[in-house]
Design a protein with these regions (language model features):
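Sec/Tat signal peptide C-region and signal peptidase I cleavage site
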Residues: 16-20
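Glycine-rich, phosphate-binding/catalytic loops in enzymes
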Residues: 236-237
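Substrate-recognition/specificity elements adjacent to catalytic centers across diverse enzyme folds
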Residues: 21-230, 241-243, 247-250, 254-256, ...
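Sec-dependent N-terminal signal peptides
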Residues: 4-14
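Compositionally biased, intrinsically disordered low-complexity regions
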Residues: 12-15, 154, 305
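Compact, glycine/acidic-enriched structural inserts
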Residues: 242-246, 250-316
Length: 330
């Protein structure tokens, strides 16, 4: 028997403006209504139902926040490029990368043009669920990180791709001096093969019903994720009357199931370390360090200023300013 506890959630939420300034009062005061039902099985796993996809996303956010607000909320330091306020100078290095890559402006510029209306509605419903949870839970340690915005959630997707695609690893190699300034063909081949030594990755195993004694289909997903942090799995089942039906794992701050199954298919997720990053070695003008050689011409770098708020000691904070330079390659 399942020990079922049902929660019906209603929300009057904010307008559909992705980067709107939210206030605590406006979250409950303005705009649209969401409704979701959350039931829990004997393992505590939430089964979320909504008539619309965005209703179901709203309920998923509420359930996830109820179970693991720590990992969801602490992700906001990373997604907002505020790790310096949490970890001091060490965290500011990550903030610099996020700002130098202009992730936030990329999201702002492409939100409506790159994402369908259906996807935007799911994202906005999910964010509404997180903020509604915050409104009715007054005693938690993460009030200062609310409200959460759609931009925050989308930044999480971009950052996850940076890690899984190997971009961060390549940057760390550059910082550690693991790339030689001048390379012959032999050293390039050596680096290529060294990069593929001792690869440990995730795996998924599917067994057909024709191969099992009880004629059951089995799916084993072993994705090698940590038990805590921004990429820790959270199990849930989400279903709507519009056809959404998935059960499996998602990350803190994500409205979508990443690994799992439905009535027709099952799927896993693995990071197989493909080579997705190019590193360009630029020749700098010896008489002008702000220029690099491109097509036999000296081209000026594009320069920008980033501001990095950093925790110095206790409540003492300081905003540091740093220049970064871009070539046509990025």
């Amino acid at each position: 028997m399942k020990n079922i506890a049902t929660v019906i959630l209603f929300l009057l939420t904010f307008s559909n403006v992705v980067m709107a300034e939210y206030s605590q009062g406006s979250i409950l005061k303005n705009s649209l209504s969401y409704q979701a039902t959350i039931t829990r099985d004997i393992w505590g796993v939430p089964h979320v139902y909504g008539k619309r996809d965005e209703d179901a996303a709203f309920g998923l956010a509420f359930a996830h926040a109820d179970d693991d607000i720590k990992n969801i909320a602490e992700n906001m330091y990373l997604y907002r490029a505020q790790m310096g306020l949490k970890e001091g100078f060490k965290g500011a290095v990550t903030d610099y990368l996020i700002k130098a890559l202009k992730i936030h402006s990329l999201i702002d510029e492409n939100y409506h043009s790159s994402l369908s209306e259906d996807v935007r509605e799911v994202l906005e419903g999910y964010v509404a669920g997180l903020n509604y949870w915050n409104e009715i839970n007054v005693n938690h340690n993460y009030k200062s990180l609310f409200p959460i915005t759609v931009r925050d959630v989308l930044t999480g997707f971009v950052i996850q791709n940076l890690y899984f695609s190997g971009v961060v690893t390549e940057i760390e190699k550059l910082q550690d001096g693991r790339y030689q300034q001048k390379s012959d063909q032999n050293s390039l081949q050596t680096r290529f093969y060294d990069g593929y030594k001792n690869i440990l990755g995730s795996n998924a195993i599917a067994v057909s019903s024709f191969k099992t004694d009880d004629e059951s289909t089995r799916l084993v997903i072993n994705s090698h994720q940590p038990l805590d942090g921004p990429v820790a799995w959270y199990e849930a089942h989400i279903k709507s009357d519009e056809g959404w039906n998935m059960m499996g794992g998602t990350f803190p701050g994500s409205p979508f199931i990443f690994v799992g199954f439905n009535e027709n298919i099952g799927w896993g997720l693995t990071v197989n370390k493909p080579d997705l990053t190019d590193v360009y070695e630029l020749e700098i003008n010896s008489t002008n360090e702000n220029q690099y050689l491109l097509d036999e011409k000296w081209i000026p770098f594009k320069e920008s200023l980033v501001r990095l708020p950093v925790k110095i000691l206790g409540p003492i904070k300081w905003t540091f300013k740093r220049q970064f330079r871009e070539s046509v390659h990025g």
